[in-house]
C-alpha cells in the first residue's frame, strides 16, 4: 500500500499442540491471535502449503503469509518423503500433459491462494540442498518459477536458503538465489554483510533465524548457553529464560541483535 513495513515474522508448522496435525479453525485462530498480540505481523508456513483455515484466519487478523510449497525437491531428505514424487509424472485428472507432481501441486497451491489478501510471497522450498546451482537445479528453479508466474505474477517468489551460513556464504547456490525475487536467509546472519556486498541489488530477509527453544518451568543460569555436550546434564531440557537454542540456530537475543545493528 505504498507504506514501508518491517517484517516481524515467525515460521510456524501446521500442528496445534495436543491436537496434533488435526486442523481446527478456532485453535488456529487462537494461535495466530496470540502471535499477533505478541507483535507478529507475518507468518511463514513451514514447510508446506497452509491449511485453508490458517489462510482464512490470517486474512481475518490482518497477518501477512508467505506460503511455502516444498521442504525438498528431487533430492529428498527422508526415505519416504516428497522427494519420491517431485519429478514423477502427475496422474491427477486435472494435471496438465507433461506435469510432474511438483508442477501440479505448486500450481494448485497458487490457484487456491492467489485471491487471498493475506498472502504476499510464494516460497519454492526450504533448505533444499540440491539447489546448488548445477544444471539440474537451475533447470528446476526456472521450471518452478514459470509455474508460479503462469498463475500469479503479482507476488514475489522466494526460498528459505541455509547454504549462506557456511563459510562466507558464497557458492553455486548464489546462481539459484539470483533468479529469485527475494532471497530468504536461514541462520545466515553472520554472513549478511558479505552477501550484501557481493549482491547489492538482492532483496534479503531472515526466513528462519533464532530457533530458540524452551522447556516450560525448567531454568538454567542465564550465562550458560545450551550446547551439545551438556544435554544429558540438563536431562535434555532447555532453559525457560530464553538463553538456550538448537545447535544450528541462535538465541532470540542473538538474532535480534544482528537485526538491530542493521536497521
Segments (PLM) and residue ranges:
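Active-site core of glycosidic bond-cleaving carbohydrate-active enzymes
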Residues: 184-189, 193-263
Amino acid at each position: 500500500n505504498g507504506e514501508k513495513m518491517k517484517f516481524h515474522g515467525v515460521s510456524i508448522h501446521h500442528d496445534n499442540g495436543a491436537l496434533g496435525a488435526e486442523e481446527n479453525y478456532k485453535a488456529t485462530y487462537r494461535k495466530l491471535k496470540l502471535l499477533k498480540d505478541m507483535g507478529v505481523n507475518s507468518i511463514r508456513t513451514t514447510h508446506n502449503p497452509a491449511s485453508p483455515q490458517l489462510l482464512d484466519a490470517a486474512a481475518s487478523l490482518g497477518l501477512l503469509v508467505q506460503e511455502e510449497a516444498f521442504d525438498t525437491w528431487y533430492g529428498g531428505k527422508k526415505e519416504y518423503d516428497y522427494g519420491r514424487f517431485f519429478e514423477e509424472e502427475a496422474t491427477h485428472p486435472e494435471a496438465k500433459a507433461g506435469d510432474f507432481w511438483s508442477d501440479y501441486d505448486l500450481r494448485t497451491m497458487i490457484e487456491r491462494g492467489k485471491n487471498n489478501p493475506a498472502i504476499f510471497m510464494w516460497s519454492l522450498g526450504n533448505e533444499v540442498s540440491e539447489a546448488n546451482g548445477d544444471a539440474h537445479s537451475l533447470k528446476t528453479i526456472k521450471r518452478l518459477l514459470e509455474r508460479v508466474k503462469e498463475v500469479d505474477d503479482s507476488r514475489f517468489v522466494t526460498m528459505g536458503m541455509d547454504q549462506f551460513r557456511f563459510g562466507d556464504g558464497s557458492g553455486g547456490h548464489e546462481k539459484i538465489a539470483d533468479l529469485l525475487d527475494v532471497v530468504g536467509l536461514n541462520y545466515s546472519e553472520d554472513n549478511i554483510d558479505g552477501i550484501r556486498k557481493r549482491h547489492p541489488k538482492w532483496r534479503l530477509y531472515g526466513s528462519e533465524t533464532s530457533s530458540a527453544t524452551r522447556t516450560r518451568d525448567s531454568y538454567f543460569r542465564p550465562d550458560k548457553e545450551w550446547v551439545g555436550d551438556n544435554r544429558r546434564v540438563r536431562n535434555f531440557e532447555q532453559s525457560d529464560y530464553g538463553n538456550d537454542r538448537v545447535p544450528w540456530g541462535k538465541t532470540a537475543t542473538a538474532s535480534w541483535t544482528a537485526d538491530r545493528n542493521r536497521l
